[in-house]
């Protein structure tokens, strides 16, 4: 169970537990609801499980940037595209731990370490494990995204103190091969299974704005809602088009469609932390407020998300103050 979920009061809410038997048609039907009805339903679900005035604040650090052999069409870190991004070596553990300490001092409660790899190599495991254990010792919730994992690697990361492992599905299965060809959908599902079997929490979501249809978005959420366990953390990214990538000229998704994505995610995965990930830099405070109303309860803080910009700390502090929201208490 997500440690941040608050107890349910059976006198006030439907005691039914989250479902794992959603059909694609049911998820599509949620997307088709009138906007205000959908947001109202999502807000009701949100209040069953969480304090709607609280936000979890996460910070993300790229511990190894660029040079990835994959061809994910949205990503600046692929070596297959000319994006002008210089590849870097894996950071030293001490550097990462110092960055995590700074993040905690700035208000972050969760620290995620990302490496631009297709898969984790055993030779890198000791250094990654040192990063994780050092960040964990600071009292932060730990997350990593390092590509595909074997069962033994997942167990080693768990032993090092990793709380969450991020491995996104990106989009629905019917649209996936239009975005990525170097890794199959099943590859991603297999890594998620290894993470679950190792006893770690899963962080898994996707991206909107890649040219997909509403049915494709429903397909992604249907996949997540029918996993053996819902993702403990569910990030939704609004594509930040990167010049030089195949999706560099993508048109922005309608803002209300992004809110619909948040709302449906909250309804079908009611106990997940639903995170607004990439894309907040170009969102108005009104749009973000709608997302929080629709069930988003986590954001990334810090001026950089891997290779894209994110709102400055002062902007986020002003946003929370304007909305009278507060950072989520540490579990």
UniProtKB/Swiss-Prot annotation:
Enzyme Commission no: 2.8.1.6
The keyword Translocase is annotated on this UniProt entry: no
UniProt: [2Fe-2S] cluster binding residues: 112, 143, 203, 275
Keyword Acetylation: no
GO MF: 2 iron, 2 sulfur cluster binding; 4 iron, 4 sulfur cluster binding; biotin synthase activity; iron ion binding
GO annotation, biological process: biotin biosynthetic process
Domain of life: Bacteria
Family: Belongs to the radical SAM superfamily. Biotin synthase family.
Quaternary structure, from the entry: Homodimer.
Role noted for this protein: Catalyzes the conversion of dethiobiotin (DTB) to biotin by the insertion of a sulfur atom into dethiobiotin via a radical-based mechanism.
Protein name per the record: Biotin synthase
Organism of provenance: Phenylobacterium zucineum (strain HLK1)
Gene name as annotated: bioB
């Amino acid at each position: 169970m997500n440690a941040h979920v608050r107890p349910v009061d059976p006198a006030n809410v439907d005691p039914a537990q989250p479902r794992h038997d959603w059909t694609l048609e049911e998820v599509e039907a949620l997307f088709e609801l009138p906007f205000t009805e959908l947001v109202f339903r999502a807000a009701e679900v949100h209040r069953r499980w969480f304090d709607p005035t609280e936000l979890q604040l996460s910070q993300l650090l790229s511990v190894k940037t660029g040079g990835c052999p994959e061809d994910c069409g949205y990503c600046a870190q692929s070596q297959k595209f000319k994006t002008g991004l210089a590849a870097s070596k894996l950071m030293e553990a001490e550097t990462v731990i110092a960055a995590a300490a700074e993040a905690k001092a700035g208000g972050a409660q969760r620290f995620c370490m990302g490496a631009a790899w297709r898969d984790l190599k055993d030779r890198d495991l000791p250094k990654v494990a040192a990063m994780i254990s050092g960040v964990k010792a600071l009292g932060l919730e730990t997350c990593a995204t390092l590509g595909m994992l074997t069962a033994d690697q997942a167990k080693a990361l768990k032993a090092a103190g990793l709380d969450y492992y991020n491995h996104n599905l990106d989009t629905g299965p019917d649209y996936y091969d239009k975005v990525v060809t170097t890794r199959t959908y099943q590859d991603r599902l297999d890594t998620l299974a290894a993470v679950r079997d190792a006893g770690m929490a899963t962080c898994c979501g996707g991206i909107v704005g890649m040219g997909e249809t509403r049915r494709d978005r429903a397909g992604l959420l249907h996949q997540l809602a029918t996993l053996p366990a819902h993702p403990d953390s569910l990030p939704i990214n609004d594509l930040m088009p990167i010049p030089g990538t195949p999706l560099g000229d993508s048109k922005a998704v309608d803002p209300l469609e992004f809110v619909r994505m948040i709302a449906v995610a909250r309804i079908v995965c009611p106990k997940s932390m639903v995170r607004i990930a990439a894309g907040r830099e170009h969102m108005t405070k009104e749009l973000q407020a709608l997302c929080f109303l629709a069930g988003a309860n986590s954001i990334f803080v810090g001026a950089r998300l891997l290779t894209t910009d994110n709102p400055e700390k002062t902007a986020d502090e002003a946003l929370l103050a304007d909305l009278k929201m507060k950072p989520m208490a540490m579990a």
